[in-house]
Amino acid sequence: MATLDSDVTMIPAGEASSSVAASSSNKKAKRFEIKKWSAVALWAWDIVVDNCAICRNHIMDLCIECQANQASATSEECTVAWGVCNHAFHFHCISRWLKTRQVCPLDNSEWEFQKYGH
């Protein structure tokens, strides 16, 4: 039996009848029991970068170039590119950036592709 708070006690499903006797021996009655708990989880990419630092869109959304051409662009074409510095950008954004500068936009280290794709 795990106590979360002084007023709340979680009781596993099989121990409900034995805990009635135990709780009757306690002088202070509990306010409520949790009989069922449905946990919810959220899945996310295991990367620290949530937004592309160049276009400021979420890294898993379309970049601004693909949003402008949304009729012809698909999410498969708008992929993520990682550098050896572990910074991630939309491939279209970093490609445009690399035409003028061969460095990472965030740490100014020489850019080299580490990984490309979803």
UniProtKB/Swiss-Prot annotation:
It comes from the Eukaryota. InterPro entries: RING-box_E3_Ubiquitin_Ligase, Znf_RING, Znf_RING/FYVE/PHD, Znf_RING_H2. Pfam families: zf-rbx1. The modification N-acetylalanine is found at A2. It is found in: Cytoplasm; Nucleus. Zn(2+) 1 binds at C52, C55, H90. One of its GO terms (cellular component) is cytoplasm. Its main location: cytoplasm. GO terms for molecular function: zinc ion binding. Widely expressed. Expressed in shoot, siliques, meristem, flowers, floral buds, open flowers, leaves, stems, roots, germinal seeds and seedlings in dark. Expressed at a higher level in tissues containing actively dividing cells. Zn(2+) 2 binds at C63, C66, C78, H92. Pathway: Protein modification; protein ubiquitination. Zn(2+) 3 binds at C85, H87, C104, D107. Disulfide bonds: none annotated. The keyword Transferase does not apply. GO terms for biological process: auxin-activated signaling pathway; jasmonic acid mediated signaling pathway; protein ubiquitination; response to auxin; response to jasmonic acid. SUPFAM superfamilies: RING/U-box. The RING-type zinc finger domain is essential for ubiquitin ligase activity. It coordinates an additional third zinc ion. Belongs to the RING-box family. Component of the SCF (SKP1-CUL1-F-box protein) E3 ubiquitin ligase complex, which mediates the ubiquitination and subsequent proteasomal degradation of target proteins. The SCF complex plays a crucial role in regulating response to auxin and is essential for growth and development. Through the RING-type zinc finger, seems to recruit the E2 ubiquitination enzyme, to the complex and brings it into close proximity to the substrate. Promotes the neddylation of CUL1. Part of SCF complexes, which consist of a SKP1-related protein, a cullin, a RBX protein and a F-box protein. Part of a SCF complex with ASK1 or ASK2 and CUL1. Part of a SCF complex with CUL1 and TIR1. Interacts with CUL1 and CUL4. Component of the CUL4-RBX1-CDD complex. This is RING-box protein 1a. It comes from Arabidopsis thaliana.
